[in-house]
Amino acid sequence: MAPQFKRPELFGFDKSHAQSFVQGKWISSPNNKTFEVDNPATGEIIGKVADVSVEETKKAISAANEAFKTYKNFTHVQRSQLLERWAELIMENKDDLVKMLTLENGKPLSQAEMEVTTCSGYLKWYAAEAVRTFGDVAPSSLQSQNFLISIKQPVGVSALITPWNFPAAMIARKGGAALAAGCTAIFLPAFRTPYVCLGLVRLAQEAGFPDGVLNVITSSDASAHGKELTTNPIVRKVSFTGSTNVGKILMGQSASTIKKVSMELGGNAPFIVFPDFPIDQAVESFCTIKFNSCGQVCVCPNRVYVHKNVYDEFVSKLTEKVKTIKVGDGFDSSSAVGPLISQDGCKKVSKHIEDAVSKGAKITVGGKEISSSKGYFFEPTVLSGVTQDMLVASEETFGPLASVFKFDDTEEVIEWANDSDVGLAGYVFTNNLSTMIHVAKELEVGLVGANIEMVDEPFISFGGIKQSGFGKEAGRLGVQEFMVVKEINLKTL
């Protein structure tokens, strides 16, 4: 049964199809072209969404540019107040947003509620940061009567390209930073999950943001719109969350106009367990982060490295824990793991399992797609006897697969953990403070969870290194990504 919404108009259900949002108006494609969005838990069609052309993206860029001329001069307090109001409206409409997030993404309601609440948290953080975008003043080293003044200004029109795995949180994490800095924005949400973005932006409109400050382009052809956003000289900033391969394409396109770019790309997170840490606690922490959003999280552990002295115990307890995990529709309150986003996701998990088993790994639980379901469900799976020559060591699975490696000593596991082209998150579990600090420092990642699975909250500056990208979101550095520094040499009379 489809969920009932208190305000169906938030998602365009009051019309024949949901629309894009440009210059304060909800628009359809000129030829009324649409694309369908399905529920990954059932395969059923949720509805139709406007499939607009690149011409609409050009109009959105023009609208954002015109709005920037006014919005950049809003005071820090005005921007802060607008963000606070947006955050309040999100919480007032939380139930509808949570239902839509579960409907189009598939994650359980409890996880969807956490994500929507996090949206509000990001915006409240940025509301506070909006009034803290200070510059600096220093005396000149050459002329005693001179002052060197650094001021921070918004970079300009920003393209914000968001993913399907956290389609609500990324709107707030990127959009809140841009708006706090004084930028205007064009959102390009993933075609699999456009509805929650449309709902959030409608609430931003109700919060009082002027026409043109926020725009949304909906399309089934992200590459065409992405190319326009990255090559149009009016756009001065591109922020993208998604795969490393797509990130490379967008970076190359952005180079044509030398834009400021932030990239939050793929991960291959190591999860390292030393023998002095309580195994039950390590298993609990691992499952909390690994099976969140069915493993479709860029910071979730992809490689589990367990010391040889506790390896068998860890695998045994992890296997028993995974056997208890309920897989099902996100609207079922007993479900802990929902579906993958598409059939392609199921195929990749199967590919990694088949490769590992062919090279000697053993399945201790799970291992199969749940074929009795109409959705894209896969059994939570544990592999033991995993080695560095298997695909799971070098490729991000992005699914409910726990691949457990055995290591002998600290330097060996650090070498294995760093044997990756990407470096977003890593985890280390040990009660030895020296070991913890050493491993945390040596891991080639941008985020480390030390005895904790949490590496993402509004106060943390989120981002990776290597081919996981660059730039920071949230935290003290998030707003700075949308600002430029101007130096003024002032001579007093």
Swiss-Prot record:
It is found in: Cytoplasm. Pathway: Amino-acid degradation; 4-aminobutanoate degradation. PROSITE patterns: ALDEHYDE_DEHYDR_CYS (PS00070), ALDEHYDE_DEHYDR_GLU (PS00687). It comes from the Eukaryota. Homotetramer. InterPro entries: Ald_DH/histidinol_DH, Ald_DH_C, Ald_DH_CS_CYS, Ald_DH_CS_GLU, Ald_DH_N, Aldehyde_DH_dom, Aldehyde_DH_Superfamily, Succ_semiAld_DH. GO terms for molecular function: succinate-semialdehyde dehydrogenase (NAD+) activity; succinate-semialdehyde dehydrogenase (NADP+) activity. Coiled coil: none annotated. Its EC number is 1.2.1.16. The gene is ssd2. One of its GO terms (cellular component) is cytosol. NAD(+) binds at residues 242-247. Catalyzes the oxidation of succinate semialdehyde to succinate. Can utilize both NAD(+) or NADP(+) as a coenzyme. Functions in the GABA shunt, which allows to bypass 2 reactions in the TCA cycle by removing alpha-ketoglutarate from the cycle and feeding succinate and NADH back into the cycle. It catalyses: succinate semialdehyde + NAD(+) + H2O = succinate + NADH + 2 H(+); succinate semialdehyde + NADP(+) + H2O = succinate + NADPH + 2 H(+). Keywords: Cytoplasm, NADP, Oxidoreductase. Belongs to the aldehyde dehydrogenase family. This is Succinate-semialdehyde dehydrogenase [NADP(+)] 2. The active site is at residues 264, 298. One of its GO terms (biological process) is gamma-aminobutyric acid catabolic process. Pfam families: Aldedh (PF00171).
